[in-house]
A protein has these predicted regions:
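P-loop NTPase Walker
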Residues: 1-95, 252, 323, 484, ...
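Inter-lobe coupling/hinge region of RecA-like P-loop helicase motors
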Residues: 4-26, 30-38, 231-241, 260-324
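Coupling/switch/interface segments within P-loop NTPase motor domains and analogous charged loops
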Residues: 80-148, 152-153, 393-443
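ATPase/helicase motor core of nucleic-acid motors
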Residues: 227-229, 315-437
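Helicase-core coupling region on the C-terminal RecA-like lobe
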Residues: 237-304, 334, 356-361, 367-368, ...
Length: 556
């Protein structure tokens, strides 16, 4: 009898997975790219790669992923976002303080509209490396005036620096790059420069590409994987140990149907397999099917509450829950409704607002009362538009003149009054109602909304607890599809699973690769069981792509 026959299916699966990992670890190449599907052991690989290496660097581009990786790789590697790394390097090499404001490109975009009457997407110019574009001259002029960078322009700056001074590119024992499928041309330029001096390992999955809004392109990981120069050694991690069998099979159904419909053209062909594990098999037996249900919009929180309580009866232990909705307002509605039912451990993950507001400016001025960018932001909200245009044109023609030198004394004093009151609040000093009203009015805060939030928090934190005690501490995260990247939970609820949200084209028969990736990322957050909840009576297209034996339908 052969050794293979003596091994159990679990031992065989473990042996095969180890062989895939060892191929990567034992490769002598200094440039490697690993295509790893959801839950296939990327973090374990990172840990193994970093063993016995001292000077290492791990880069990704999402703050939430940095936090998770920093914890998982604690003591093994410095983990940074690309813009954070660019800022620290530029500061170190230039020996200057580098200021970065995440909405800076939006401000310069508005300046361009008001000063030269042109709509310019500066981030796109940086992301796509349009280095010679004439509009970058205007951007640089405004950057110099405000003494700030944005996230894209700080990466652009360090790339240009390294391209000019190649001898100053730092070297590391190992560089790891996470989520490479979501990198754009600018970010890839930085990675290629760093790869000239250090061993580098890129990890990503072109089936999980979500960030096309920042000009990310799957062609970069595909070119590296398929051997386009510079030559990278290519590997895969095929075994998913996160999800139950039905989730892995459903993901494969989606990919197979997409390919049948001539979608996902150019996709890296790689296996995605359920990892045979004795403990996971118990969860597969307990949760063999995906649950699909149609619920009217306002019934969705009720349905989620009902299912969580059913799961509690079955599990008799705490477990994690992830609620994924297409829109922030849907996520917020569900979160607040669940809180009113007694759930107290809800993490409502809200993406930062893209547009800047007066509070952004006030924050900068609280740190430095002479901050030029802070005064620029505040000016937008205290001046009539014609006065703002005149002010900005003055700063453009006469950049030596600071905004605080142009504003009227009354405007300056009003802002300083607010800053003074806020500093009082910071120091927990008393502020009377009249002064507090000044703050509310100046910062354009919706006092009714603030009061509603306060009362809701007070009710939920009251000693008179509402709802079933068993549900109060269940950890729940409620978020959007894009913000779910990097997350995983025992039980996942995907809400508003309708063509109107999951297929972006007005013609719902036209499905994009991006739509497919969104759905694949959403369902593969699941460890044990997935619930798909539609708010429309029409059967969702993606549900039709999953074999019927993999899901059950629960009527309202």
């Amino acid at each position: 009898m052969t050794e293979e026959k003596l091994l159990t299916k679990y031992e065989i699966s473990k042996k095969e997975r180890t062989e895939f990992v060892n191929k990567i670890l034992e490769s002598s190449g200094t440039k490697k790219v690993v295509v790893a599907g959801p839950g296939t052991g990327k973090t374990y690989l990172f840990n193994q790669i970093l063993q016995n290496k001292k000077n290492t660097l791990t880069l990704t581009f999402v703050n939430s992923l940095v936090e998770d990786l920093s914890l998982e790789l604690f003591g093994l590697s410095e983990v940074r976002t690309l813009h954070s790394y660019a800022r620290s390097m530029l500061s170190k090499l230039s020996k200057k303080k580098i200021n970065v404001f995440h909405k800076f490109s939006k401000i310069v975009q508005e300046d361009a509209k008001l000063i030269i009457d042109k709509e310019i997407d500066f981030n796109k110019l940086f992301h796509e490396r349009e280095d010679e574009n004439e509009h970058l001259i205007f951007y640089k002029k405004r950057r110099d005036y405000y003494n700030y960078y944005g996230y894209a322009s700080i990466i652009f700056a360090i790339v240009k620096y390294f391209e000019k001074y190649a001898d100053r590119i730092p070297s590391y024992d190992q560089i790891l790059i996470d989520e490479f499928q979501d990198f754009n041309k600018l970010e890839v330029s930085l990675i290629d420069l760093l790869a000239k001096k250090s061993p580098i390992l890129l990890v990503g999955d072109d089936d999980q590409a979500l960030y096309e809004f920042k000009s990310a392109n799957t062609k970069f990981i595909r070119e590296k994987y398929n051997g386009v120069e510079p030559k990278y050694d290519s590997f895969t991690l095929p075994f998913c140990s996160r999800s139950t069998r039905v989730i892995v099979e459903a993901a494969n159904d989606i990919i197979k149907e997409a390919k049948t419909k001539k979608l996902l053209i150019g996709r890296i062909d790689k296996p995605y397999k359920y990892f045979e594990d004795e403990e996971k098999e118990k969860e597969c037996f307990k949760y063999p099917l995906i649950t699909y249900s149609h619920q009217y919009d306002k019934q969705i929180p009720w349905f989620i509450d009902k299912k969580i309580k059913e799961l509690l009866s079955l599990e008799k232990r705490s477990f994690s829950v992830l609620i994924i909705s297409p829109l922030k307002k849907q996520s917020y509605f569900i979160s607040t409704n669940l809180m009113s039912k007694g759930y107290q451990n809800i993490d409502y993950i809200e993406k930062d607002k893209k547009e800047f507001n007066i509070i952004d400016g006030i924050k900068l001025l609280l740190e430095d009362k002479n901050d030029v960018l802070g005064w620029r932001i505040v000016s937008k909200f205290i001046l009539p538009e014609k006065d703002l245009i005149a002010l900005l044109k003055t700063t453009d023609s006469n950049p030596e003149k600071k905004i605080i030198e142009i504003l009227s004394k009354n405007h300056i004093n009003d802002v300083k009054k607010v800053l003074s009151l806020l500093n009082y609040l910071r120091k927990k000093k008393p502020v009377d109602k009249e002064d507090f009203d000044i703050i509310i009015k100046s910062l354009k805060i919706d006092s009714l909304n603030v009061l509603k939030e306060y009362l809701l928090n007070e009710i939920n934190s009251s000693q008179f607890k509402i709802g079933d005690p068993a549900i109060r501490k269940i950890p729940i995260k409620s978020t959007t599809i894009q913000s779910s990247k990097g997350l995983a939970a025992d039980f996942v609820f995907i809400t508003h699973f309708d063509n109107s949200y999951f297929i972006r084209n007005k013609d719902k028969s036209i499905i994009s690769d991006h739509d497919i990736c969104n759905f694949l990322v959403s369902i593969t957050r699941t460890k044990n069981k997935l619930f798909l909840i539609s708010s429309s009576k029409d059967e969702p297209t993606f549900l039709k792509w999953i074999k019927k034996e993999r899901y059950e339908i629960i009527e309202r």
